[in-house]
Amino acid sequence: METKISCKEATLADNASDILKSTTADNILTVPEEGITVTGILIGGQPQGVEWNFEPASSATFDHTIYDQEMNNGIAAKKSVTDPNYTLVLDNKNSSTADPKQSMVYVTVELENNMGDFYGAEGLIPKGSRFYLVGQLDPNASTATKPSGDPIDRVFVKDHTTVANFTITSLKKAYNHIPDLRTSKINVGLAVDLSWQKGITFDVEL
């Protein structure tokens, strides 16, 4: 998977008004010139193993997560788009005859708060700590661009590169802990533009 991340604006609003339940206005944080440091990417929806052809078995469950902490060139989220980061993932083809629907995939971007204290989805995220924003990759979304003539029906396809362009639109849905990517009850805080190079590209707002 090829991942790029940027901020929609040079300032980002937090979730203070909702968390504090008062007349307090949301805090507006300025994105540092060097950007918000990206320290990792977590990719859900992975099978526990694959067959000889590198496709999941018909009995496979897709509840495993890849945690990639090797970020290319120390990427950071800012107004301009970052250099891409690459993560090797497994095909997530669902071959089950009982429920053949191809699943969406949740991806979490891990960042270091180098801006200042702010309020996320569940509470305070202090300066210097790590926080997490989640994006949803849906192969059937209108923001998913598929190669012409290539019948792609899932997020990850062997011999293809899935391209996910994440955009941070606010800090309101930021977590102060790693969220469980196996549940659908999750705050999606990234906008995604998805496409494939012989695969998919996602443009996702966070």
Regions found by a protein language model. Give the residues of each.
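Intrinsically disordered, low-complexity repeat and linker tracts
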Residues: 156, 165-206
